[in-house]
């Protein structure tokens, strides 16, 4: 009996994907360019149907036709290298699937090259981390629909399940699947930073004990803020350091990095004139955090505001922070889904925004309760430009904007940095401003650079002689 699927790349994610497939009844062939990872996986299987191969040709020949090969290798040149090695061994109609974090434009290049050879190619976004890979991730496949249909029975089996539905849906042509995963990661960056800023207010402004803050996040996770990231934040805050007994959060260095997909999201938005400001600010917050030595030195040089300490009603302010966080998250998701919509329109992808929201509900890092509402909005208004103007969200933001404004103002007056909460507020106010100050920018550009401008009272382009 031939193997039904092959997995190449047996790091943590690849191994767990292979184990996931095996647990769902697939006959899985596995291959890694180094033998040790293959041997480690075999030791874990406990009799599951994972069969190791140590020669690529043997691996390929073991697969039933049309062959389906799932790549879980490092994005970039390693993917090209593996594909180059596979192509001479494959036949027309075989399918290669890239489940790594490849840039969607690389996926489109590979798709074009392989299609010319008669080989199907799917760029598959996978979210959920190592646990999701093993127990069921959110899966975002892009490529030709007929090629997807060949792999769909396996992909839908290994995906997370929510209310009986798999968190896997055909996204669109060519690089659409990896594009959706890329922006997902940008939303994830923003979501994480917004939560960090809410935590900062509770701890530094309200001076709440860390265990009490954990309880607050637990409470929030029972309501409209219910999400994976809120849930794990409560767990993180309760964790004690085994060496010191202190809260682990207090001994973790405040310096973080990024793996590239967040940056790609911002660059793609910039290239296409899409205002993904909250997502981009969350990236810049990470860059600023990496300047640890500079920040430590600046702390002793740069003055903050002189403020009079005044008592704050904790219950009132805790609820304001909740409102601020909810509104910030809605604005961040609105930016991400607007980026989906605008890019889909530019490329003719027809991204299924309703379904994208649904498959984000399980397995993935940004799974959240309000994704149900986002899906309902796009079900009613599939061509909606921005979630902010959907009646259900607009009414909630009308109610919650006061909380966000008060939290941002209190933070600013206290010298606390709230890059994403303040940017969310600016985005909200900017988006609801029918007549902006961009007319002055146009006049300035015309003054010094002879750039033309349009008028409000007649059609055409104009230039003024300012001198």
Swiss-Prot record:
Organism listed in the record? Bacillus licheniformis
Its pathway, per UniProt, is:
Carbohydrate degradation; pentose phosphate pathway; D-ribulose 5-phosphate from D-glucose 6-phosphate (oxidative stage): step 3/3
Functional note: Catalyzes the oxidative decarboxylation of 6-phosphogluconate to ribulose 5-phosphate and CO(2), with concomitant reduction of NADP to NADPH.
Q: Give me the residues that bind substrate, please.
A: 101, 127-129, 184-185, 189, 259, 286, 451
GO annotation terms (biological process): D-gluconate metabolic process; organic acid catabolic process; pentose-phosphate shunt
Identification of the protein by name: 6-phosphogluconate dehydrogenase, decarboxylating
Q: What is its EC number?
A: 1.1.1.44
Q: Which SMART domains match?
A: 6PGD
Coding gene? gntZ
What Pfam families does the database record attribute to this sequence? Answer: 6PGD, NAD_binding_2
